[in-house]
Curated annotation (Swiss-Prot):
Disordered: annotated span: 1-26
SUPFAM superfamilies, sorted: L28p-like (SSF143800)
Family per similarity comment: Belongs to the bacterial ribosomal protein bL28 family.
Cell inner membrane found in the keyword field: no
Entry's transmembrane regions: none
GO biological process annotation, one example: translation
Molecular function (Gene Ontology), one example: structural constituent of ribosome
Name of protein: Large ribosomal subunit protein bL28
Length: 61
């Protein structure tokens, strides 16, 4: 399963509920992008969430 290298976000699981309170399993997936960033001074290709990219927590190489 892909996981955000910066924030640790990954797929979350839960239930979807109808008005009659029936339930079925569903998942919430973060918007992950595979980008090249500097890790310990070397370029590395990792999964990063779009939110981390937009907020400037990482910069592309």
């Amino acid at each position: 399963m892909a996981k955000d290298f910066v924030t640790g976000k990954h797929t979350r699981f839960g239930n979807t509920r109808s008005h009659a309170l029936n339930h079925s399993r569903r998942s919430w997936k973060p918007n992950l992008q595979k980008v090249r960033i500097l890790v310990d001074g070397k370029p590395k290709r990792v999964w990063v969430s779009a939110r981390a990219l937009k907020s400037g927590k990482v910069t592309r190489v």
